[in-house]
């Protein structure tokens, strides 16, 4: 896609809509966006691409100020992502293809995690979040669903965690349960998830978690 502005700080991957259709849960498939979708373009960033943001590694003692700063950073990054995705969308529609953008959101329609995996931008680590072997934990910014046929990336089939248990040990709320050789993330015990889904009531009830499982990951430092 020569001529389409994509920031050097962003990761871009291409996934087959057919494979995402099979792997995503009901209600979060490409067909819930667009009939006859063929491709999903994923825009994301890894922690190493944010290494100039000191707060990403060292969360401040005042959660309110830290949370506001994080929100401001996310807003700016997603604002940049919207410009990029709109440019790609316009490029595709000018070529006669359909394209729909889906910005990141906790209540979004598309299965972002599965899209990241299929686009080769990360693998599921022990903590159930996506990890790029070089850039670290992956933050999805946006996706584009299109009926354009594209060359798809290959999922990464590697173990990025090995014997590391830092993310599991960092959670004091018991949000990870061992199932066989893997760990299962328990949403109702995750304070970050609760805070995002219920920001007013739970912010003061449980206290902050500050995504310690993600920040504990040593990859991409």
Which residues fall in each region the model found?
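Catalytic cores of enzyme domains
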Residues: 23, 62-221
């Amino acid at each position: 896609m020569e001529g389409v502005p994509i920031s050097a700080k962003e990761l871009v991957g291409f996934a087959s809509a057919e494979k995402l259709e099979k792997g995503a849960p009901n209600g979060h498939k490409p067909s819930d966006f667009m009939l006859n979708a063929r491709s999903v373009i994923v825009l994301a960033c890894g922690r190493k691409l944010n290494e100039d943001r000191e707060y990403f590694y060292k969360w401040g003692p005042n959660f309110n100020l830290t949370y506001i700063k994080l929100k401001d950073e996310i807003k700016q990054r997603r604002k940049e992502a919207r410009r990029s995705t709109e440019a790609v969308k316009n490029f595709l529609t000018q070529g006669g293809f359909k394209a729909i953008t889906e910005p990141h959101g906790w209540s979004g329609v598309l299965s972002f995690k599965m899209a990241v995996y299929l686009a080769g931008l990360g693998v599921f680590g022990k903590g159930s979040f996506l990890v790029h072997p070089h850039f670290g934990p992956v933050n999805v910014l946006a996706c584009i669903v299109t009926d354009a046929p594209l060359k798809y990336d290959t999922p990464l089939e590697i173990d990025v965690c090995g014997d590391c248990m830092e993310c599991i040990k960092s959670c004091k709320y018991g949000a990870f349960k061992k199932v066989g050789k893997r760990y299962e993330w328990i949403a109702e015990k995750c304070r970050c998830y609760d805070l995002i889904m219920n920001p007013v009531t739970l912010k003061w009830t449980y206290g902050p978690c500050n995504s310690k499982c993600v920040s504990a990951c040593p990859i991409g430092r």
